[in-house]
Design a protein with these regions (language model features):
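N-terminal interaction modules that seed assembly of large macromolecular complexes
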Residues: 54, 62, 67-116
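A structured, charge-rich N-terminal accessory region that forms the first stable segment of a protein
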Residues: 59, 132-153, 164-174
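Glycine-rich, aromatic-bearing surface loops/beta-hairpins
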Residues: 166-200
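Short, Lys/Arg-enriched N-terminal segments with co-localized hydrophobic residues
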Residues: 34-53
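Long, compositionally biased
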Residues: 101-137, 141
Length: 200
């Protein structure tokens, strides 16, 4: 994997996969995608429309809340849309304000409190146990959601952006960890979201 990683920073994702996909097993490509989406700089270069006027703290707060939504969904085995429906816009604005403090706590502790407070029941959408490959981390998927929120949110309205993305069909597509959706080009996901369907 080292020789792949060395070239990662010098190639855009499409060119990278074009060069190596014919010579790499799927598990390696998935790993490369996880490395790729952990680099905020690389992803931001891909994603047209990313809001560059926000402070790093504001972006970090969005990232934290996106990770938290993903964690709660996995823990309760729910669709991401079903989780976000429990939160009003004011609720999410509060979570964004608390993000700087809550990130010092474990996701487990914070999620337990929210699951109890908002009465989030267990579902049957178990994307982790159904995954036949290495499960992408909560933080990797959270970063992907963060970039989508930054790309589509109206007038720096982060709470509304989170609601819009997590209420969308795109979350079920990303949550299918047996597919290649979660490690495809982030701008492709943005365009698919705006189109209301996965583009061919």
């Amino acid at each position: 994997m080292i020789r792949y990683g060395i070239l990662l920073m010098g190639l855009c994702q499409e060119r990278f996969l074009e060069v190596f996909s014919g010579n790499m097993p799927n598990s390696d490509i998935r790993h490369i995608r996880l490395v790729f989406i952990r680099s905020t700089h690389c992803v931001a270069l891909h994603l047209k429309g990313v809001n560059l006027s926000m402070t790093e703290k504001q972006k970090d707060d969005i990232y934290y809340v996106c990770c938290l939504m993903e964690f709660i969904a996995r823990k309760t085995k729910n669709h991401r849309q079903d989780v976000v429906r429990h939160f009003t816009k004011k609720d999410l604005e509060r979570q964004l304000r608390l993000a700087e403090v809550n990130h010092c706590l474990s996701f487990e502790q914070v999620s337990d409190e929210l699951i109890e407070d908002y009465k989030i029941q267990d579902g049957m959408f178990d994307t982790v146990n159904e995954c036949r490959y290495e499960v992408p981390s909560v933080t990797s998927i959270g970063m992907l959601y963060q970039e989508l929120v930054l790309a589509i949110m109206p007038e720096e309205d982060a709470a509304q952006g989170i609601i819009d993305i997590f209420s969308s069909f795109i979350t079920d597509e990303i949550s299918d960890f047996n597919s290649n959706v979660y490690y495809t080009n982030p701008d492709y996901l943005r365009c698919s979201y705006l189109e209301g369907k996965m583009l061919a």
